[in-house]
Each structure stands twice: as C-alpha cells, then as structure tokens.
Amino acid sequence: MRGGAHGPGDRAGRCREHRQDHAGPCAGAGAPFARPAGHAGGRVPARVLRRARPHAAARGTGRHRRRAMASHRGRRAGRSHRAGRHHAADDRGLQRVRVRRPQSLPPGARAPAPLRPHAADRPRPGLAARRPAARRRPGARPGRPLGPRRAGLCRAALFGGLWRRLGAHGSRCGCAAPAAAPARPGGPRARRPAAAWPLPRMPAARMRTSVVRVRGEAPIAMSEPDSSSPPAHPPRPIRSFVLRAGRMGSGQTRALAELGPRFVLPFQREPLDPQTVFGRRAPRVFEIGFGMGDATAQIAAARPDTDFIGCEVHTPGVGALLKQIGERELTNLRIVQHDAVEVLDHMIEPGSLAGIHLFFPDPWHKKKHHKRRLVQPAFVERLVTRLAPGGYLHCATDWQPYAEQMLEVLGAEPALRNSADGYAPRPEYRPLTKFEQRGLRLGHGVWDLVFTKHQGRSASKQCTATSSP
C-alpha cells in the first residue's frame, strides 16, 4: 500500500512514520482513507470508520456485509437530507463514507471531487433497459416493462401485410415497426387504392365475387366467403359428458390392472367380431354410461344367455365394474372406455343389437346446456340403425323435463313403437340404481320408456305422453 511523502497511512489517516496528525501529502489521495473535508485534525469518528471499513475486511463474506450495510442505510434514510457524501479510495476498491456536511470550507480548501460509487450503491437499470433494442416497443421508455408476447405470435405475424397496412402495428406485440417509406421528390407519397390491399388467403372454392362501391371511386370487385359451400373442416361435435377426476380405490386399481386386459376392449375403427370377443354368437345388448356398474353387473348375472357391452368414460366406474366382474365371475360382459357415439359409429355393426340401455343419463338442467343432452333426434336415428328388427330401446331418468323430451323425441321416430301408453313401468330385469334410490329419497319420480323397433318403417303410430303415478 502506497502512502504520501512520509510513508503509508494507518486506518485513522495518520502517517505511520511520524505517528501524528498533520496536513500534507499523507492525507492525499494516496492514503487508504482520506480525512473528510471539515476534519482539520484529530481522530476520525468511529461511526465514520465503521462506514468506511472495506467489505473484504469485514466479518464474514462480502455479500453479507453489503446486505447489512444496505439495511443500515435504509434505516438512516430519514437523516439523509442532513448528511453529505464523501468518497475515499484505496487499493481494495471504491467505498462511500457518510459524514456530516460542513457549513463552510476552510480558506483555500477545495471540495473533494466526487468519485464513482460502489457497485452495490449504483442504481441498477430496469428490466426493459437491459433488454435488446430489437424487442423494445417503439416509443417505449427504457424503464417501462414490455407487454407480454402471447404464445410467441403477434398480430402482424397472424394477419401479414394487412395488419401493417391498417396502421395497427404499434401494439404490445413486441415486433419492430415497419420502416417509413422515403419521401418522393415530387411530393408526399400517394395513398394506395383500397383495391390493391391484400386480403386474407382463402380457398378459391369458398370465395365469391361481389361489387363494392366506394365514395368518390369506381366500383371495386372484392371477394367474399361463400356461405353456401361446406366448411373446410367439419364442426366439432358437442359432447354429452365432461371428464372429471375421481379417486380410485385400491380394489378398483387392482381390478383394473388384473382384469382390464381381458375384459376392457380397446377402441378401434373396425366392427367387433362377437366370436372373437365372447367366443360365441348370442344376442347382444349395448349399455351407454353404466356409472359404477352395479345395475349392469346384476343384469348380466341375471341373463347369462345374453352378451353385454358396457360403454363408460370414467375410470373409477370402469374399475368398479371390473371388481364386480371378478367377484361374480361374469363371462358375458365386456367394457369399452370411450365415447359412446364413436363406439356406435365404428365398433357396432348396423342391425346387430338386440337391445340398448340408457339409464339415468346426465339431464343437463340448464337451458343453455340442453344441447348436450344425449337423447336428440340425430342420436336416436343412429341408435335405430344399430338395432335389429324387434330390438328394444330402454331409457330411464329421474328428471321430469328430460323424461318429457325423451318421450317426444322417441315418439317422433317413425321406426320405433312405444311398448306402453306413455311411460312404461319398470321392467323386472332392471334393478334399482344408485341414482334411482337417491331420487326416491328426495321425492323425485322415475320414468321408464321402452320402445321397440318394428319390422316395417311405414307403419304409423301415435304416442300419448302421460305421467305415471
């Protein structure tokens, strides 16, 4: 460490050679800690030494020391207006010393030049200022954050030149604004006609030409989408169910792992072969939405000469029915865990079912959700095509408005015939389900509808909707 003309200085700013306080080269910039302005002689106060102590010489690591000093400066922020700042330099770096500002300087003395503060005391630029200039929004201040770029795309990338020509590129998309065109020598740049603006791309089969008249200009031929042609992609079908997460018991999990490979049929786009699936050819009944499978297992156990295919999307219900299959040792029951509409379209052959069970489907109580109800005219037509002549369709619900809709839709199908005058009594083969027992406890009624597919489609029928007591 270098000092003044007499020798290196100590922590108090005194010359180590003379061991006394004096003004001279020893108190210059070469000393490790120069005596602040306003202290002509004597020892430097201890509080000043504590502020001026180097971080590396402090107890512990420099990171903890800087944190402690930063918190101390925060507590003394209230007195910052009465204190000045003086900087001292040594070979270890730049430190900032907080001393009291003197009222006046001695004659001939000059205030010390301010030095660059320590890195911990320098203000850090904002996040937007540290970002590259290419991602900065035009006209944004350095300290303000940029708007989020959603999904990595912007409006200009989605709509191409049309968005830039409409002058909407100054949004928060984060893209660079298009460069302005150079001014022409003859005058300002003329505006391009509206007919020259590019339009979004669309297949030629779906475009039709129409004439649009713009004020002050000649008629312009523009292309519009043709609503008469079919859309490029088919609309997404409305699902009648919502997958919800449910708990799986240990017995259901074990049954799903042990019996699933044998009794759960994977979805395929080819019709099922009953000889391969059941090992025989017998009447088949298709059940839509068996829930936890209690009623399905009882019906399959009571009718061993009939093969049953249950369709369910919820995994806990599939595991519960597999557990029932293992306990009852059923061999005439299989499960498909998939959407029933797609299963009917691809896995069930037309005219191959002896019966269809639809017990207590989701009623979708709200009016805006009635479109999600399973019993709709289009779905009933699909069911009729899969029924064999003389096959039956058995529906049950505990929601009276839904029962009325079922009776109306099924009665309007010309290929079905009601087996009763209105609602039918509960057949002997159908046991009380969990939903039915809950409805009876709440005082709700239960309505069964049994329709059969007659031999000739030209036969006429009339159904009278009456409520059973």
UniProtKB/Swiss-Prot annotation:
Active site: 362
Top-rank lineage group of the source organism: Bacteria
PROSITE patterns found in the cross-reference section: SAM_MT_TRMB
Segments for region (Disordered): 1-150
EC number: 2.1.1.33
HAMAP family with a match to the protein in the record: tRNA_methyltr_TrmB
Catalytic activity as recorded in UniProt: guanosine(46) in tRNA + S-adenosyl-L-methionine = N(7)-methylguanosine(46) in tRNA + S-adenosyl-L-homocysteine
Name of the protein in its database record: tRNA (guanine-N(7)-)-methyltransferase
Residues the record lists as binding substrate: 366, 398, 433-436
PANTHER family per UniProt: 3-DEOXY-D-MANNO-OCTULOSONIC-ACID TRANSFERASE/TRNA GUANINE-N 7 - -METHYLTRANSFERASE, PENTACOTRIPEPTIDE-REPEAT REGION OF PRORP DOMAIN-CONTAINING PROTEIN
Basic residues compositional bias, start-end: 48-86
Region (Unknown): 1-221
Composition-biased stretches (Basic and acidic residues): 8-22
Pathway of action: tRNA modification; N(7)-methylguanine-tRNA biosynthesis
Function: Catalyzes the formation of N(7)-methylguanine at position 46 (m7G46) in tRNA.
Any Pfam family the entry gives: Methyltransf_4
InterPro entries recorded: SAM-dependent_MTases_sf (IPR029063), tRNA_(Gua-N-7)_MeTrfase_Trmb (IPR003358), tRNA_methyltr_TrmB_bact (IPR055361)
Species assigned in the record: Methylibium petroleiphilum (strain ATCC BAA-1232 / LMG 22953 / PM1)
One Gene Ontology term, aspect cellular component: tRNA methyltransferase complex
Binding site residues for S-adenosyl-L-methionine: 287, 312, 339, 362
Region (tRNA (guanine-N(7)-)-methyltransferase): 222-469
SUPFAM superfamilies cross-referenced by the UniProt entry: S-adenosyl-L-methionine-dependent methyltransferases
